[in-house]
Amino acid sequence: MRGRRSIVPVSHPLLPRASAVVERALHDTHYLDGALDSLRSAVRDPGAEGRALASMAGDDVEGVVVFGLFGGTSGAGRLHFVAVEHRARRSGVARALVSAAIAALGESRARFVLAELPDDPRALDGSRAFLEALGFHEESRVDDFYRDGIALAFMRRELSPE
Protein backbone atom coordinates (compact mmCIF):
# COMPACT_ATOMS: atom_id res chain seq x y z
CA MET A 1 0.00 0.00 0.00
CA ARG A 2 1.28 3.44 -0.93
CA GLY A 3 0.48 6.07 1.66
CA ARG A 4 -2.46 6.10 4.00
CA ARG A 5 -5.69 4.31 3.08
CA SER A 6 -9.02 6.12 3.17
CA ILE A 7 -12.55 4.95 2.44
CA VAL A 8 -14.57 7.43 0.36
CA PRO A 9 -17.90 7.44 -1.49
CA VAL A 10 -17.54 6.71 -5.19
CA SER A 11 -18.42 9.99 -6.93
CA HIS A 12 -19.05 10.62 -10.63
CA PRO A 13 -15.43 11.75 -11.20
CA LEU A 14 -14.14 8.61 -9.44
CA LEU A 15 -16.46 6.22 -11.33
CA PRO A 16 -14.13 5.50 -14.29
CA ARG A 17 -11.29 4.45 -11.97
CA ALA A 18 -13.63 2.44 -9.74
CA SER A 19 -15.09 0.72 -12.81
CA ALA A 20 -11.60 -0.14 -14.02
CA VAL A 21 -10.87 -1.88 -10.69
CA VAL A 22 -14.05 -3.96 -11.05
CA GLU A 23 -13.21 -4.80 -14.68
CA ARG A 24 -9.72 -5.99 -13.77
CA ALA A 25 -10.95 -7.99 -10.75
CA LEU A 26 -13.82 -9.72 -12.57
CA HIS A 27 -12.67 -9.66 -16.22
CA ASP A 28 -12.69 -13.44 -16.72
CA THR A 29 -15.96 -14.10 -14.90
CA HIS A 30 -19.66 -14.23 -15.70
CA TYR A 31 -20.26 -11.63 -12.99
CA LEU A 32 -18.62 -8.51 -14.46
CA ASP A 33 -21.66 -6.99 -16.18
CA GLY A 34 -23.89 -7.25 -13.10
CA ALA A 35 -21.21 -5.76 -10.87
CA LEU A 36 -20.65 -2.82 -13.23
CA ASP A 37 -24.41 -2.22 -13.46
CA SER A 38 -24.67 -2.18 -9.64
CA LEU A 39 -21.74 0.23 -9.36
CA ARG A 40 -23.07 2.63 -12.00
CA SER A 41 -26.53 2.61 -10.44
CA ALA A 42 -25.14 3.29 -6.94
CA VAL A 43 -23.12 6.26 -8.23
CA ARG A 44 -25.83 7.62 -10.54
CA ASP A 45 -28.55 7.48 -7.86
CA PRO A 46 -27.03 6.81 -4.43
CA GLY A 47 -29.54 6.00 -1.75
CA ALA A 48 -30.64 3.39 0.72
CA GLU A 49 -30.78 0.61 -1.90
CA GLY A 50 -27.35 1.23 -3.39
CA ARG A 51 -24.20 3.01 -2.30
CA ALA A 52 -20.60 2.59 -3.39
CA LEU A 53 -17.40 3.12 -1.45
CA ALA A 54 -13.80 3.03 -2.65
CA SER A 55 -10.60 2.32 -0.79
CA MET A 56 -8.01 4.91 -1.76
CA ALA A 57 -4.25 4.93 -1.27
CA GLY A 58 -3.35 8.44 -2.27
CA ASP A 59 -4.97 8.88 -5.70
CA ASP A 60 -5.10 5.13 -6.42
CA VAL A 61 -8.38 3.22 -6.14
CA GLU A 62 -7.50 -0.10 -4.48
CA GLY A 63 -10.98 -1.56 -4.17
CA VAL A 64 -14.71 -0.97 -4.37
CA VAL A 65 -17.76 -2.17 -2.43
CA VAL A 66 -21.42 -1.74 -3.41
CA PHE A 67 -24.08 -2.27 -0.76
CA GLY A 68 -27.51 -1.10 0.37
CA LEU A 69 -30.81 -2.13 1.81
CA PHE A 70 -33.22 -4.49 0.07
CA GLY A 71 -36.09 -2.36 -1.21
CA GLY A 72 -39.40 -2.88 0.52
CA THR A 73 -37.87 -4.55 3.57
CA SER A 74 -37.35 -3.48 7.13
CA GLY A 75 -33.71 -3.77 8.14
CA ALA A 76 -32.40 -6.17 5.50
CA GLY A 77 -28.94 -5.09 4.33
CA ARG A 78 -27.32 -6.31 1.15
CA LEU A 79 -23.71 -6.65 0.12
CA HIS A 80 -23.78 -6.46 -3.69
CA PHE A 81 -20.06 -7.08 -4.25
CA VAL A 82 -16.53 -6.17 -3.27
CA ALA A 83 -13.67 -6.02 -5.78
CA VAL A 84 -10.00 -5.37 -5.05
CA GLU A 85 -7.00 -4.72 -7.30
CA HIS A 86 -4.78 -7.78 -7.51
CA ARG A 87 -1.76 -5.87 -6.16
CA ALA A 88 -3.75 -4.77 -3.08
CA ARG A 89 -5.17 -8.18 -2.16
CA ARG A 90 -4.39 -9.68 1.23
CA SER A 91 -3.61 -6.23 2.65
CA GLY A 92 -6.93 -5.58 4.40
CA VAL A 93 -8.59 -3.59 1.61
CA ALA A 94 -11.64 -5.86 1.24
CA ARG A 95 -12.00 -6.20 5.00
CA ALA A 96 -11.91 -2.39 5.42
CA LEU A 97 -14.46 -1.89 2.64
CA VAL A 98 -16.89 -4.51 3.94
CA SER A 99 -16.48 -3.21 7.49
CA ALA A 100 -17.32 0.32 6.32
CA ALA A 101 -20.34 -0.99 4.40
CA ILE A 102 -21.57 -2.95 7.42
CA ALA A 103 -21.13 0.12 9.65
CA ALA A 104 -23.16 2.23 7.20
CA LEU A 105 -25.86 -0.44 7.02
CA GLY A 106 -25.98 -0.55 10.81
CA GLU A 107 -26.44 3.23 10.87
CA SER A 108 -29.34 2.67 8.44
CA ARG A 109 -30.89 0.31 11.01
CA ALA A 110 -30.15 -2.91 9.16
CA ARG A 111 -30.64 -5.95 11.39
CA PHE A 112 -28.60 -8.23 9.15
CA VAL A 113 -26.56 -8.23 5.94
CA LEU A 114 -27.08 -10.74 3.14
CA ALA A 115 -24.47 -11.43 0.47
CA GLU A 116 -25.73 -13.31 -2.57
CA LEU A 117 -22.62 -15.26 -3.49
CA PRO A 118 -22.18 -17.21 -6.70
CA ASP A 119 -20.65 -20.38 -5.24
CA ASP A 120 -18.05 -20.43 -8.01
CA PRO A 121 -14.61 -21.11 -6.51
CA ARG A 122 -12.88 -21.08 -9.91
CA ALA A 123 -14.09 -17.57 -10.71
CA LEU A 124 -14.34 -16.17 -7.18
CA ASP A 125 -11.59 -18.01 -5.34
CA GLY A 126 -11.56 -17.27 -1.64
CA SER A 127 -14.85 -15.35 -1.57
CA ARG A 128 -16.70 -17.80 0.67
CA ALA A 129 -13.79 -18.09 3.13
CA PHE A 130 -13.47 -14.29 3.21
CA LEU A 131 -17.14 -13.82 4.08
CA GLU A 132 -17.00 -16.59 6.67
CA ALA A 133 -13.98 -14.90 8.29
CA LEU A 134 -16.11 -11.76 8.61
CA GLY A 135 -18.89 -13.63 10.42
CA PHE A 136 -21.14 -14.53 7.50
CA HIS A 137 -22.67 -18.02 7.34
CA GLU A 138 -24.61 -19.78 4.60
CA GLU A 139 -28.29 -19.37 5.31
CA SER A 140 -29.59 -21.11 2.18
CA ARG A 141 -28.68 -21.87 -1.42
CA VAL A 142 -30.22 -22.40 -4.84
CA ASP A 143 -28.37 -25.16 -6.69
CA ASP A 144 -27.55 -24.65 -10.39
CA PHE A 145 -28.76 -21.04 -10.23
CA TYR A 146 -26.10 -19.44 -12.42
CA ARG A 147 -25.46 -22.54 -14.53
CA ASP A 148 -25.04 -26.27 -13.99
CA GLY A 149 -22.93 -26.81 -10.91
CA ILE A 150 -22.86 -23.15 -9.82
CA ALA A 151 -25.20 -22.40 -6.93
CA LEU A 152 -26.35 -19.13 -5.48
CA ALA A 153 -25.39 -19.13 -1.79
CA PHE A 154 -27.09 -16.71 0.59
CA MET A 155 -24.47 -15.69 3.15
CA ARG A 156 -25.88 -13.88 6.19
CA ARG A 157 -24.40 -11.87 9.03
CA GLU A 158 -26.45 -10.60 11.93
CA LEU A 159 -25.80 -7.05 13.08
CA SER A 160 -25.69 -6.16 16.74
CA PRO A 161 -28.52 -3.96 17.97
CA GLU A 162 -27.44 -0.48 19.08
Q: Language-model segments: which ranges?
A:
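Conserved active-site alpha-helix within GNAT-family acetyltransferase domains
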Residues: 95, 119-141, 148
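Short hydrophobic/aromatic beta-strand or adjacent loop that forms the aromatic wall/cage
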Residues: 50, 150-154
